Design a protein with these regions (language model features):
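N-terminal periplasmic "start-of-domain" segments of outer-membrane beta-barrel proteins
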Residues: 45-77, 103-108, 123
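Short acidic/polar hinge/loop motifs at secondary-structure boundaries
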Residues: 95, 123, 130-156
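A beta-strand signature from Gram-negative outer-membrane beta-barrel systems
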Residues: 143-187
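Transmembrane beta-barrel wall of Gram-negative outer-membrane proteins
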Residues: 192-219, 224-262, 288-305, 353, ...
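Conserved C-terminal beta-signal and adjacent last beta-strands/turns
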Residues: 241-242, 253, 402-403, 462, ...
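Membrane-embedded beta-barrel scaffold of Gram-negative outer-membrane proteins
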Residues: 299, 310-315, 319-323, 453, ...
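Gram-negative outer-membrane beta-barrel transporters
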Residues: 353, 408, 520-522, 542-627, ...
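Structural signature of Gram-negative outer-membrane beta-barrels, strongest in the C-terminal barrel
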Residues: 354-366, 389-523, 571-574, 605
């Protein structure tokens, strides 16, 4: 038996040798790519700037794993249907469900979020600083227009000490900047399986009152039966420069998705027989969803002095959601959600014993209210009401962070966040209100990190962090107890984790960037998903005793020639149950399902200054277990994608064209895997080779 620390010891030896080699290759006297005093980067490989991680902008000084993505990864020639297309290359991040828009994309970071049956759990999502994650930890991205996103940052690891509940990782998305003059864009894309996307935008950023408006209409027939979708999306933002020290930004988002059908999952025999088929129950019960959502946000920024600034944000979301599930009892859900919040953050820079110290203090208040009703699903028709409950989740929080540059070599960061969560259910179905309940949770999430500069462009770092995650309101309301008459599942509790990380990152010889991280997390009360025989297709949740997650993440980026960039990434994930007994079976040492043990990614970009580009991406996924017992798995598979495009200048305007091809190797893989599904229905097949093309005109 291989000792469980074997890989960690091997990695430590590799890290030491790797750093020694890099350090020997660097020349401190001539290599000036990271300036500590000015916090800027100068090198031939385009610099990374961290803009979403509180008050830190230099990744070499930051003792955390952060991946920054630019427009070439996010939007150049992409189909633009799901966020997973853009985040595929991030180490430690695993995305599924690019084809089932009724279930929404599933994203996990270092295993956090892997339990989700639909949407995103366990990680926080922001757009231009506004939270897209509700107070209880749910994120849906059906309202995000991916062509509107210009850059992104991913914090790979626990961040509850900064962002609170369900922050096993953080995804920060930033929309495109205001154009320097009045600019109009129009684009159209089309592709396999009835895909189409029509978009238009107008904006102007030349004055102190800037604006940008973008609309899009998407349709998709789907690879599988009963997988059609359509949506209309509108985004607008305005920036008002009130004076030289303050500005006000207002953002509005609207989405109307009247149809997103759910083809359901299949067992292995059904998937092998006909990959395009839908589960017959999903057709009979007309499974799918529709969404209508409005979101409004405002941000005020004030430069208090030359060394301090204040930011205040507020937001409100109104969401109406209804779906049909592939069973009768409670198989139709109607949800009306209101979610609002306000946050304030003050940052000041000073000196302590002649050394720079930066302090951030902040407070957040958010309130989520879900009116959830369930009806019987009579083969697509609404039956009698069987559930009616008002669920609320209120969060009050305070946090602080300090960053202290001890000398020109050592930077220390520490801080904590204190959260109070009030969770309540009011039963409107049973007249005596027996289903009502209330609980209050308090949590402190400390963290500390240290960075040591090997030279001006390379560093090693370590950090410790604490992460807590409450069950979402949806998870709490799905009580597996057949005698339950409403309220929340009293046996479902928050999970708590403690994480330790070491790593190194930096730039070598003006053309090479590396990022290597080793992490380990211990999770108590890990929340897992499962199904019951009497309710196939409905997901329930439970706590297991303990799990351990440890892994290695490596990413390399290099300019290998004129206009050519090569990105490589590797992730090793060893996520195991440590204290879990199920049906009298000891599952200690079993791997957590739904996550590949090994992932390798390779992207090569050629971008000609005249506008021509070609991008090739290859991703290799290792074995993925499908249930807690580890007696079902899928074999390793590889995905090869290609994007080609060009830009033409015509009469003062620009014409862009692109064509893309996905899964060129014709792999028979699965776009989604339903963990612990009853009856072996784990599989949602993905399409084989498919193409798309598009054009855009910029006036």
């Amino acid at each position: 038996i291989v000792n469980k620390n074997y890989y960690m010891k091997k990695f430590s030896l590799f890290l030491f040798s790797f750093l020694s080699l890099l350090y020997a290759q660097s020349d401190n006297s001539s290599l000036v790519v990271a300036n500590v005093d000015s916090d800027t980067l100068r090198f031939q490989l385009k610099p990374i700037e961290v803009v979403g991680f509180l008050n830190s902008t230099n990744p070499v000084l930051t003792p955390f794993s952060i991946t920054s993505l630019t427009a070439k990864q996010l939007s150049f020639g992409q189909r633009g249907m799901t966020l997973g297309e853009s985040l595929r290359s991030v180490p430690g991040l695993f995305a599924m469900n690019d084809e089932n828009f009724a279930q929404d994309i599933r994203i996990s970071i270092r295993g956090f979020g892997s339990r989700s049956a639909f949407g995103i759990r366990g990680i926080k999502l922001f757009v231009d600083g506004f939270p897209q994650t509700t107070a209880d930890g749910q994120s849906q991205v059906d309202n995000i227009n991916l062509s509107y996103i210009q850059s992104a940052e991913v914090i790979r690891g626990s961040a509850s000490s900064i962002y609170g509940n369900a922050s096993g990782g953080v995804i920060q998305l930033f929309t495109e900047p205001y154009p320097n003059k009045t600019q109009i864009k129009s684009s159209i894309s089309a592709g396999s399986f009835g895909y189409s996307n029509i978009q238009s935008s107008i904006g102007n950023g030349a004055s102190n009152q800037k604006y940008l408006l973008k609309v899009s209409s998407k349709k998709y027939d789907g690879f599988r039966d009963n997988s059609e979708m359509s949506s209309f999306n509108l985004n607008t933002k305005s920036l008002f420069e009130l004076n030289k020290n303050s500005q006000l930004s207002i953002h509005y988002n609207y989405v109307n998705s009247p149809i997103s059908n759910d083809p359901g999952s299949l067992n292995k025999e059904q998937a092998d027989d006909n990959r395009r088929s839908a589960r017959i129950q999903n057709i009979n019960y007309q499974s799918g969803e529709k969404v209508l959502q409005h979101r409004l946000g405002a941000s005020y920024q004030l430069k208090v002095s030359t060394s301090s600034k204040l930011e205040i944000i507020s937001f409100y979301t109104d969401r109406e959601f209804s779906n049909k599930l592939p069973f009768e009892n409670g198989g139709q859900v109607n949800l009306k959600r209101s979610y609002w919040g306000i946050g304030a953050k003050y940052v000041t820079d000073n000196y302590l014993f002649t050394h720079p110290i930066s302090t951030t203090i902040g407070a957040d208040i958010s309130d989520q209210s879900d009116r959830r009703k369930r009806y019987n699903n009579i083969r697509g028709d609404r039956g009698s009401k069987v559930f009616d409950q008002l669920e609320s989740f209120r969060n009050n929080a305070f946090y602080f962070q300090q960053s202290y540059l001890l000398n020109n070599k050592i930077n220390v960061i520490w801080g904590s966040r204190w959260d109070n969560d009030k969770i309540e259910s009011l039963d409107y179905y049973i007249s005596d209100g027996l289903g009502s309940g209330f609980t209050s949770l308090n949590n402190a999430s400390p963290f500390a990190g240290l960075t040591y500069l090997l030279n001006k462009s390379m560093s090693i770092y370590t950090n410790y962090s604490n992460h807590y995650e409450t069950p979402t309101l949806n998870e709490l309301s799905n009580d597996p107890d057949s005698l339950s008459v409403g309220g929340f599942n009293p046996k479902l509790n928050p999970q708590i984790s403690n994480s330790l990380e070491i790593g190194s990152k930096g730039y070598v010889n003006n053309y090479f960037y590396y990022d290597v991280a080793l992490f380990r997390s211990k999770i108590d009360n890990e929340i897992t998903s499962f199904e019951l025989e009497e309710s196939p297709g409905k997901t329930f949740y439970r706590n297991i005793g303990e799990s351990q997650k440890e892994g290695i993440e490596i990413s390399l980026s290099s300019s290998i020639g004129n206009n050519i960039t090569l990105n490589l990434g590797y992730t090793y994930s060893k996520f195991e149950y440590a204290n879990y007994v199920k049906n009298n079976k000891n599952l200690n040492g079993n791997r957590l399902p739904g996550i590949p043990q090994n992932t390798f990614n390779s992207d090569i970009y050629y971008i000609n200054p005249n506008g021509y580009f070609i991008m090739v991406g290859l991703t290799r996924y290792g074995i993925i277990y499908l249930n807690d017992l580890n007696d079902h798995e899928i074999d390793p598979y590889s995905i090869l994608n290609l994007r080609i495009g060009n830009e033409y200048k015509l009469f003062g305007s620009k014409l862009k064209v692109h064509i893309g091809a996905n899964n060129l190797l014709n792999a028979n893989y699965f776009s989604n895997l339903r963990v612990n599904a009853w009856g072996g229905r784990f599989y949602e097949p993905a399409p084989q080779a498919n193409i798309y093309m598009g054009t855009e005109v910029i006036f």
